[in-house]
């Protein structure tokens, strides 16, 4: 160093070449976004140390393209600093970001997006992963289309052991990467995530305001001398949780334990309070692209009894069954998820509902890009009960679309149509045949969180048409939902 001034091999440091680049083409707020950019560089393993965030190899630059500048000299070239910072951010180059950020801050004009991105990388390198992830989510609320940004967020989530969130980001990233070498890197991350043996939790809360809890038809509906029940309303909340843990074995095999639970509580109509808990465990096989599992389960349901019940929940029914699940990535943009379930039901009081059931579900997902998904699914459900007028067969078609928009807005739209046919006539002499429709629209902002919980606003509409007048109804509701995966 001459006169205490550090000399910087600038282009060597950030792995760039100025040959063929025109500095006059820099736009202050615009960043070029090639589909794969520098993501074709690879890492050796998904099991990286936390100090190796910027370990992706850079291309060798011939010596004739290296320019040595001091910091003071570099500070005289704001366009060069800007170009270097942008590419350092894209390349996930921590050393270059930490060098250029102080220089960039000295300039009279700053781009907040670039500053926040640089802060995210710096916080990550300092080991403050929680703050780094917060910065990345703030950036995602502004622009969810930048692939290097998604990769860096996925990395930070991975090293912070937010496994489920990291897996979602890597799977989205996989849909937009064409380079086979980098696809292999993503698959290594996914395989490592699948093999991690820690508990994963998903929790959520909905605020309920249902003006037709008992799915009553229009008031005054009659069939002969029979009169339909009247509507009942209720305000309250619904809570649900999913918890699971895997224990990896050799050769891609694993064992799994899972708990699912949900409950509804209406403070002004407690007769409709209910809760369900399912416990299961079994064996499975997984790679980065395929997961198959088979597990028996036991389920218990508590219910206050509905219109003829009390304000206290009591044990209502038990189920014992077995479930087979399969998830398979057919290609980088197509995934199929299938489930088969068989169970036997036993009711504490309503013995005429005892029996067994079969359930088959298959869903095909299409992810054309990381900010969008579509799905189509079909279900078959057969319920066999001792009283044949309660036994039925149902076929369901499901459609869905999810989208990350500009300005941090995300949306999800789902639609389903079901055809339900009962086996025998009821007491009135009608063999019930229903057509059931449901649609839900959900909106949320990607950068709005409260204690790690993301609020989502949903509108839900349900309609049932039937040859049985007592089972014709429609209702809609708007509710707030909050949830978290950790």
Swiss-Prot record:
Annotated family: Belongs to the Slam family.
Region called C-terminal probable beta barrel, residue ranges: 198-486
Transmembrane segments: 199-209, 237-248, 253-262, 276-286, 290-300, 320-330, 334-344, 358-367, 373-382, 395-404, 409-419, 437-446, 453-463, 476-486
Record text about domains: Consists of a soluble N-terminal domain and C-terminal probable beta-barrel in the outer membrane with 14 predicted beta-strands.
Its membrane topology: Multi-pass membrane protein
Record key words, sorted: Cell outer membrane, Membrane, Signal, Transmembrane, Transmembrane beta strand
Keyword Signal: yes
Taxon lineage: Bacteria, Pseudomonadati, Pseudomonadota, Gammaproteobacteria, Pasteurellales
GO CC annotations, alphabetized: cell outer membrane
Role, per record: Required for correct export to the cell surface of some cell outer membrane lipoproteins (tested with TpbP) upon heterologous expression in E.coli and probably also in Haemophilus.
Disulfide-bonded cysteines: none
SUPFAM superfamilies (alphabetical): TPR-like
Main location per the UniProt record: membrane
Residue segments, region N-terminal domain: 30-197
Protein name, as recorded: Surface lipoprotein assembly modifier
First and last residue of the signal peptide: 1-29
Subcellular location: Cell outer membrane
Biological source species: Haemophilus influenzae (strain 86-028NP)
Pfam family for this entry, one: SlipAM
């Amino acid at each position: 160093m001459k006169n205490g001034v550090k000399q910087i091999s600038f282009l060597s440091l950030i792995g760039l070449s100025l040959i063929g680049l025109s500095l006059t083409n820099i736009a202050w707020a615009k960043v070029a976004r090639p589909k794969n950019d520098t993501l074709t560089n690879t890492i050796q393993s998904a099991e990286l140390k936390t100090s190796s965030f910027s370990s992706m190899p850079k291309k060798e630059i011939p010596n004739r393209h290296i320019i040595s500048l001091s910091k003071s000299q570099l500070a005289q070239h704001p366009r060069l600093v800007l170009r270097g910072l942008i590419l350092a951010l894209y390349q996930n180059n921590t050393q270059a970001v930490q060098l250029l950020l102080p220089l960039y801050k000295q300039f009279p004009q700053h781009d907040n997006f670039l500053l926040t991105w640089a802060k995210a990388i710096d916080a990550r390198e300092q080991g403050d992963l929680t703050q780094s992830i917060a910065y990345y989510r703030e950036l995602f609320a502004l622009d969810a289309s930048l692939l290097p940004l998604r990769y860096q967020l996925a990395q930070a989530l991975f090293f912070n052991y937010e496994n489920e969130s990291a897996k979602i980001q890597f799977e989205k990233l996989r849909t937009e990467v064409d380079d086979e070498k980098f696809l292999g890197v993503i698959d290594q991350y996914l395989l490592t995530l699948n093999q991690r043996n820690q508990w994963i939790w998903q929790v959520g809360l909905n605020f309920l305001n249902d003006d037709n809890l008992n799915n009553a038809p229009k008031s005054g509906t009659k069939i002969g001398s029979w009169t339909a029940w009247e509507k009942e309303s209720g305000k309250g909340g619904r809570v649900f949780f999913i918890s699971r843990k895997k224990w990896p074995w050799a050769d891609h095999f694993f064992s799994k334990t899972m708990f699912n639970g949900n409950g509804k509580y209406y403070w002004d109509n407690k007769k409709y309070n209910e809760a369900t808990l399912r416990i299961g465990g079994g064996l499975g096989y997984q790679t980065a692209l395929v997961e198959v599992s088979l597990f028996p389960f036991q389920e218990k349901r508590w219910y206050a009894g509905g219109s003829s019940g009390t304000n206290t929940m009591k044990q209502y029914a038990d189920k014992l069954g077995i479930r087979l699940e399969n998830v398979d990535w057919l290609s980088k943009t197509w995934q199929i998820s299938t489930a088969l379930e068989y169970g036997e039901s036993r009711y504490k009081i309503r013995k005429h509902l005892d029996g067994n059931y079969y359930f088959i579900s298959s869903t095909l997902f299409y992810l054309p890009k990381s900010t969008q998904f579509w799905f189509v699914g079909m279900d078959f459900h057969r319920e066999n009960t001792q009283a044949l007028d309660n036994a039925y067969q149902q076929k369901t078609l499901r459609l869905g679309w999810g989208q990350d928009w500009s300005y941090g807005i995300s949306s999800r739209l789902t639609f389903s149509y079901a055809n339900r046919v009962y086996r025998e006539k009821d007491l009135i002499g009608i063999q019930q045949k229903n057509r059931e429709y449901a649609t839900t629209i959900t909106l949320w902002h990607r950068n709005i969180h409260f204690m790690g919980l993301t609020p989502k606003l949903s509108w839900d509409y349900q309609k049932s048409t039937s040859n049985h007048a007592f089972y014709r109804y429609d209702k809609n509701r708007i509710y707030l939902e909050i949830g978290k995966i950790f």
